[in-house]
From Swiss-Prot:
Sample GO molecular function, one term: small ribosomal subunit rRNA binding
Protein function: Binds as a heterodimer with protein bS6 to the central domain of the 16S rRNA, where it helps stabilize the platform of the 30S subunit.
GO CC annotations, alphabetized: cytosolic small ribosomal subunit
Pfam family name, one: Ribosomal_S18
One Gene Ontology biological process: translation
Name of the featured protein: Small ribosomal subunit protein bS18
PROSITE patterns xrefs: RIBOSOMAL_S18 (PS00057)
Native source organism of the sequence: Bacillus cytotoxicus (strain DSM 22905 / CIP 110041 / 391-98 / NVH 391-98)
Assigned keywords, A-Z: Ribonucleoprotein, Ribosomal protein, RNA-binding, rRNA-binding
Domain of life the protein comes from: Bacteria
């Protein structure tokens, strides 16, 4: 269990919002928000999605607002 042998180096994930030039995350854009929520309804962490800390905070607020407005479910299907 000391280390990986012959494994590839992990590629750094690029922030989706910085790459596409998105500065404002709208809570009404449900299709965009669904990409960052698991099938169980949980917000995916940064290490999984690759978003920067700045946009992860904005994304979390937008998802919580969308849930409050009943645009997104609190729990998955």
């Amino acid at each position: 269990m000391a280390g990986r042998k012959g494994g590839r180096a992990k590629r750094r994930k690029v922030c989706f919002f910085t790459a596409n030039g998105i500065t404002h995350i709208d809570y009404k854009d449900v299709d965009l928000l669904k990409r960052f929520v698991s099938e169980r309804g949980k917000i995916l962490p940064r290490r999984v999605t690759g978003t920067s800390a700045k946009y992860q905070r904005k994304l979390t607020v937008a998802i919580k607002r969308a849930r409050q407005m009943a645009l997104l479910p609190y729990v998955g299907e």
